[in-house]
Regions:
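Residue-level signature of mid-helix packing/kink "hotspots" within the transmembrane helices
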Residues: 42-50, 134-135
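Intracellular juxtamembrane helix-capping segments at the cytosolic ends
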Residues: 101-114
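Loop-to-transmembrane helix entry/capping segments in MFS-fold secondary transporters
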Residues: 31-32, 116-126
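Structural signature of the two symmetry-related core transmembrane helices
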Residues: 63-77, 158
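Helix-loop junctions at membrane interfaces in 12-TM secondary transporters
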Residues: 80-91
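A membrane-interface helix-boundary motif in multi-pass transporters
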Residues: 146-160
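Helix-loop boundary and gating motifs at the non-cytosolic
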Residues: 1-42
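Helix-to-loop junctions at the C-terminal end of transmembrane segments
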Residues: 48-60, 145
Length: 176
């Protein structure tokens, strides 16, 4: 479980600290545009989390989580092919939907693997691992972009989501 949480958190965490720089530098956009793009991601995610939660109940947490991770990975990779700011709006919308699928499924999975006497502790560990992964990603993302460029960072994000997807395929039978 920790591996799944870590790699999926890294996938998104690598983008956060440098995303505005990517938008401004590569699209001659303003920081205002970067803020709007982030808002598109967050609002889309917020709107689609409840329907995604219903899909988790109907089709199962593993399938929906896998779909969300694949969507997040492909969204990360698609930044490489964006050449107009309108492409970024489309990517943020799709990324938001994908993240919306991922999060309720992951939370449902956490509820299943935790037992009642230690549920709070396990959820605390989950949140701590999520935050630690994000902190690590914040430091590493700047170094990666400075030395290897944005494209490499997007490949790394994709790879993190890909590893999470493989983890799901490997462990879904063990935890249910």
């Amino acid at each position: 479980m920790i591996t799944l949480i870590s790699f999926s958190s890294l996938g998104l965490g690598f983008l956060g600290p440098v995303y505005a720089i990517f938008v401004v530098r590569n699209f001659s956009a303003s920081l205002f545009h970067a803020g709007i793009l982030s808002a598109v991601f967050l609002l889309t995610s917020a709107i689609f989390k409840m329907p995604a939660g219903k899909l988790v109940d109907k089709y199962g947490k593993w399938k929906i989580l896998f779909i969300g991770l694949i969507g997040c990975g492909l969204s990360s990779l698609s930044y490489i092919f964006a050449f107009d700011i309108i492409h970024l709006y489309a990517i943020e919308f799709i990324y938001g939907i994908s993240f919306a699928f991922q999060r309720p499924a992951l939370l449902a999975l956490m509820a299943v693997v935790s037992n009642k006497p230690s549920r709070g502790m396990l959820l605390g560990i989950f949140d701590s691992v999520d935050d630690i992964s994000g902190a690590f990603a914040a430091v590493v993302s700047g170094a990666v972009v400075s030395s290897l460029g944005f494209d490499m960072l997007f490949f790394i994000c994709f790879f993190c989501y890909f590893i999470s997807g493989l983890f799901i395929l490997k462990t879904r039978e063990k935890i249910n």
